[in-house]
Amino acid sequence: MPVTVMTRDPAGASARLGLTAVHTFNFPRFLAVMRRRALYLNGGGSLIQDVTSRRSLWYYLFTLRAAKRLGCKVMMYGCGIGPVKRPGGVAKTRKVLNSCVDAITLREPDSIEELARFGVTGPEIILASDPALTLPAAPAEEVDAALRAVGADPDGKYICFALRLWPGFDKKAGVFAAAAAHAWEKYGLTAVFLPINHLDDGQAAALVAEKLGDTPHVLLPGPMSSALVIGLMSRMQVVVSMRLHGLIFAAGQGVPLVGVSYDPKVTAFLRCVD
């Protein structure tokens, strides 16, 4: 069966994966492709929510409905659900998911409760692990090289911070700096700032790093592959993360983790691993 990927970087995705790729917002091309496909796989992540924007929710609901109307089976895979807060959003979500989606796999019980609150009963609903837990780590030599490139000892003892910009973060940067200083002074752990999203996360890390003074710390550059992020996580003694995937990658490597919740999806995952 031919596979087509929807992405904001079609050329890059085609080069990396060897697959046909369509730009996320090329609607005529998307519709043309769906006419020739048997399955539309939507996911993963928290796509059915309106915190990002109402347009984001409307977009994903449109793709689900369009794929079904063009004759595809429709599956939502590895999803988190909600929050949906804006007027009309819950009703629209209920209508589309009940009429257009055949099956949904959810990554935490909170999302099952959210679908029940919406009144979604049409699709088959399955609770399953987040698929990111199965991603492999980069080879040890690649991880060693990444640490040496920033002057870090591959055999050192580290505490990882995976942070992101969020409204009010600048007022909390000192809290993370104090935690990093405490980890160094009491446990001999050097703070490593690891970007999951290299644009936003690098700025958040810089805000904290400038408050550390003489406390040893390492700023890892981005972007980097998910395999390298996972490999680096595996070298940490503990991971402190705002990023959901920072927590998922740490859990997958058996590394103790501390979640800092800015979004219900982070809280929901932490409940699963508690």
Regions found by a protein language model. Give the residues of each.
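Active-site anion-handling motifs in enzyme catalytic cores
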Residues: 1-274
